[in-house]
């Protein structure tokens, strides 16, 4: 579905509302210490850009929908041809919803905690009978890739590529495990909305939240950006490949904010029946736990089918608008 939206961004040269300037520079992208898809570490050069200070909220997305009449993918019926053999119930409009289990389960089978929930979408984020009451400042969820793109176009912005996102998330702390340093709980303090305890059945709520949290509830990183770790995963514009292999240069030869792979390369080899491209999502979420998904780190990356929104995936935007005159852009 292609829609044309009227841009309402300010005149060029002004500071984009709600955004921060991320000065360009070089950094070491990736990690060798956690999951194989994060390697190899390689040096990347990223020009400066603007980035949303916060993840896009329900209130912001509601204004977009009111102005544009946009309907998200989760609100539209599914095409049976795209899902051969799927039960009729699963073809109704809906989204993937997390369900906490009552006991320890097989962590290799995600269907133990993810269910297709008809009637669930961004307006009803916790199931078909839920609402946005009290969630206005929480990140919008159940957003497929094209939904995030549509919002970005309407805002005269775009989605970050993976290198831009990771560079911004690090906040100037090159090579650190987390967006705030190497210690997960400095001085015993929770720095992000993640899962403490045994996923997916025991959440100790050390950070104070069972699900998503209002944006900005945890400390900002070195660039002043909030929730670059945890809360919700965030879409990037890059197609997913199971890390770079020989597609990247050596660490001593920096790339310019690389975009690699094609849609065809991003298909899931383990699900040949679904020829659905996948994008990279970054940042981890409130469902990430050390025993299952220690991915609330800047180097972490996951594939996500572009047609699927979930209760732990949102986004933020960037802008290539020039920096204000006199601002140090290095």
List the model feature ranges, each with a label.
Residues 21-22, 28, 32-33, 77-298, ...:
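Functional-site microenvironments in short loops/helix caps that host divalent-cation chemistry
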Residues 49, 64-73, 155-156, 323:
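Short capping motifs at secondary-structure boundaries
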Residues 52:
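An anion-binding catalytic pocket shared by soluble metabolic enzymes
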């Amino acid at each position: 579905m292609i829609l044309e939206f009227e841009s309402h961004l300010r005149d060029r040269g002004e500071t984009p509302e709600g955004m921060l300037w991320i000065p360009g520079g070089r950094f070491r992208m990736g990690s060798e210490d956690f999951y194989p898809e994060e390697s190899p570490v390689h040096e990347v050069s990223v020009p400066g850009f603007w980035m949303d200070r916060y993840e896009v909220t329900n209130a912001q997305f509601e204004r977009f929908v009111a102005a544009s009449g946009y309907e998200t993918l989760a609100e539209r019926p599914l095409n049976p041809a795209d899902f051969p053999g799927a039960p009729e119930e699963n073809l109704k409009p809906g989204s993937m919803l997390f369900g906490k289990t009552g006991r320890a389960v097989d962590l290799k089978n995600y269907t133990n905690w993810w269910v297709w929930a008809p009637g669930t979408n961004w307006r009803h984020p916790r199931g078909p009978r839920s609402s946005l009451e009290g969630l206005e400042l929480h990140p919008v969820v159940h957003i497929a890739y094209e939904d995030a793109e549509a919002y970005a176009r309407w805002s005269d912005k775009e989605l970050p590529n993976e290198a831009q996102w990771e560079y911004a998330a690090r906040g100037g702390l090159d090579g650190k495990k987390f967006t705030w340093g190497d210690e997960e709980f400095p001085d015993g303090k929770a720095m992000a909305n993640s899962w403490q305890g045994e996923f997916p059945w025991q959440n100790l709520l050390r950070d104070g939240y069972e699900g998503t949290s209002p944006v900005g509830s945890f400390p900002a990183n070195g660039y002043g950006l909030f929730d670059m770790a945890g809360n919700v995963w965030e879409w990037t514009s890059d197609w997913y490949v199971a890390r770079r292999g020989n597609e990247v240069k050596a660490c001593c030869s920096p790339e310019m904010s690389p975009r690699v792979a094609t849609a065809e390369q991003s298909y899931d080899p383990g699900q040949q029946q679904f020829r659905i491209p996948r994008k990279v999502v970054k940042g981890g979420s409130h469902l990430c736990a050390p025993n299952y998904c220690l991915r609330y780190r800047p180097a972490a990356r996951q594939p996500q089918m572009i047609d699927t929104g979930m209760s732990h995936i949102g986004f933020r935007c960037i802008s290539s608008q020039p920096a204000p005159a006199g601002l140090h852009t290095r």
